[in-house]
Regions:
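Bacterial N-terminal signal peptides that target proteins for export
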Residues: 1-7
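Mitochondrial intermembrane space
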Residues: 20-111
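N-terminal signal peptide c-region/cleavage motif recognized by signal peptidases
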Residues: 16-18
Length: 111
């Protein structure tokens, strides 16, 4: 009986682990917004907001290194950047290192 219970628990763990390891696009974009908020506030004390338009995001699986940094996914699309005055529409690029690592680079370009 104990052996069956142990095998059942092991089988359940094997099935659940991949589901827990997966990270959604929304989670990745949240990581990008968090990194952007820190980075942009350091660069510009007047920074107020960076918000990604999740309806217009491209997600490219990369799984390679950029220099010495592993990057699993490249997100790019439209976002809103606000420092002083009204918000600006921008394009963004975010390099994400994967589960447990988070976003490692965020850059904006004017639209």
């Amino acid at each position: 009986m104990t052996m069956r219970l142990a095998l059942a628990a092991a089988a359940l763990a094997v099935c659940v682990a991949p589901a827990l390891a997966q990270k959604s696009t929304a989670d990745g974009l949240r990581d990008c917004e968090k990194l952007a908020a820190v980075k942009f506030k350091q660069e510009n004390p007047a920074f107020k907001k960076f918000a990604i338009d999740a309806t217009d995001v491209n997600e490219d699986k990369f799984a390679d290194k950029v220099g010495t940094q592993f990057v699993s996914t490249v997100y790019h699309g439209k976002a809103t950047y606000q420092a002083d005055g009204k918000p600006d529409d921008v394009r963004f690029v975010c390099l994400h290192a994967g589960l447990g690592k988070g976003a490692v680079f965020v850059y904006t370009l004017p639209r």
